Amino acid sequence: MQRRILNSGLASKKNRTAPSESLRPRFIFRFLVLVVSAGTILWPGQGFALPNVHEVAQAVDAHYNRLRSLQANFTEIYQGNGISRTESGILLLKKPGKMRWEYRSPEEKLFVSDGKDAWLYLPNEKQARKSSLKKLEDLRSPIAFLLGKTKLEKELQGLSFAPDVKAWHEGNSILRGVPRAMEDQVQQVLIEVTPESKIARILIDGTDGSLTEYRLSDQKENLEFSETNFRFSPPQGTEVGEGLNGP
């Protein structure tokens, strides 16, 4: 498993048919839930002792706990079931639990939540689906609570460094753990952390053999976002369905 993660951590960018929308949000939702604690830690190359995994986790918690909002460019890479696809766009997060994934490439689509309900909108297909956020089992979901109140060490069992995995950017550290209550869906999660205690990359190794990667860049903190960014009303002529756990 570690060998597959190591080789496919920087997943290829071949277009693919869309995977199930079911697995991706619950994790990133309970996950972009990082918070609480700690102060500044010192990283390799700064001339001091290396931090331990607890210090890194606490610093990540502290960084995101102080934020009211976050904007980032994201790249989502999926490999599994003979499918390979890369998508990208803009991510907006706002306390408490609000998120907007605005996919712009290769096709436009929107995944948005007001903290209570979530919508997936496919404009090219004129389709929209709605689900309660509590019932949603999607790997994007934990990210909604990145600005929340949960400690990283409580979210991930067996948290440790992953020195065998190549970092996206030199100087970053990679953490490895298993998300609690998701052992049936996720074998392990890898989190790449910058020296500034920001999350740069998340890799999710599914029990079905899939690998989903999220890369976050150009992060902008504490911007003012209108509440309308996190609401959705289906345009006229849109076919509306319930539930996001299907393909």
Model regions and ranges:
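N-terminal secretory signal peptides that target proteins for export/translocation
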Residues: 1-26
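Sec-dependent signal peptide recognition
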Residues: 29-34
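Flexible, processing/modification-adjacent segments and terminal tails
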Residues: 50-78, 84, 122-187, 234, ...
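An acidic-aromatic
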Residues: 90-142, 212
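Gly/Pro-enriched, hydrophobic low-complexity segments
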Residues: 154-244
